[in-house]
């Protein structure tokens, strides 16, 4: 399937499985009359494969060591990208950032690394399913930077176009999205 055909098919899946209308309170605290819940798309076999394919194509030339983001939205996505990268003989490992470190065990903020493995000096991409203001992704960025990593890109599947671009620019973080909310609202 061509990239444009993959993109169109994924948009159809998102529209069917993950987009809705109706008043909702977003993670940012804002109210909205539409929403995206990408988990049904990320956990659908075809949706996961297409998200991984399109995201991997975006990352392929970035010389990325790791991909991850804030739990819960980044977990299925990072896992799918890691799996596809292995199949493409260009492995990119995955991790996720806890919203709050566990109060028992190793008390880690960043999960998925093997014993003795570190993000120090590694090139990382932060992924997110849906971005509104950028606040959640910036929390993940801060935790990963504390681990000594370099953030090369913040990549979201859907940008709600409500300030994230400006927030990432102000933080000096490159930002891209696979889709803009307006692509689903104007159909």
Swiss-Prot record:
This is Orotate phosphoribosyltransferase. 5-phospho-alpha-D-ribose 1-diphosphate binds at residues 98-99, 102, 104, 128-136. GO terms for biological process: 'de novo' UMP biosynthetic process; pyrimidine nucleobase biosynthetic process. Orotate binds at residues 132, 160. Pathway: Pyrimidine metabolism; UMP biosynthesis via de novo pathway; UMP from orotate: step 1/2. It comes from Rhodopseudomonas palustris (strain TIE-1). Homodimer. GO terms for molecular function: magnesium ion binding; orotate phosphoribosyltransferase activity. The gene is pyrE. It catalyses: orotidine 5'-phosphate + diphosphate = orotate + 5-phospho-alpha-D-ribose 1-diphosphate. It holds the Pfam family Pribosyltran. InterPro entries: OPRT (IPR023031), Or_phspho_trans_dom (IPR004467), PRibTrfase_dom (IPR000836), PRTase-like (IPR029057).
């Amino acid at each position: 399937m061509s990239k444009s055909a993959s993109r169109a098919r994924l948009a159809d899946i998102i529209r069917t499985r993950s987009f809705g209308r109706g008043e909702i309170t977003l993670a940012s605290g804002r109210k909205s009359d539409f929403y995206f819940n990408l988990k049904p798309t990320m956990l659908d076999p075809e949706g996961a494969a297409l998200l991984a394919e399109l995201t991997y194509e975006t990352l392929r030339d970035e010389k990325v060591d790791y991909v991850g983001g804030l739990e819960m939205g980044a977990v299925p996505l990072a896992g799918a990208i890691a799996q596809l990268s292995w199949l493409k003989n260009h492995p990119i490992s995955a991790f996720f950032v806890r919203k709050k470190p566990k109060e028992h065990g190793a008390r880690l903020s960043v999960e998925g690394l093997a014993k003795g493995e570190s993000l120090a000096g590694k090139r990382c991409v932060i992924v997110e399913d849906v971005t509104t203001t950028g606040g959640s992704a910036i929390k993940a960025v801060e935790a990963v930077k504390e681990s000594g990593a370099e953030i090369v890109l913040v990549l979201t599947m859907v940008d709600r176009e409500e300030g994230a671009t400006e927030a990432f620019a102000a933080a000096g973080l490159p930002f891209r999205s696979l889709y803009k909310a307006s692509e689903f609202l104007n159909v």
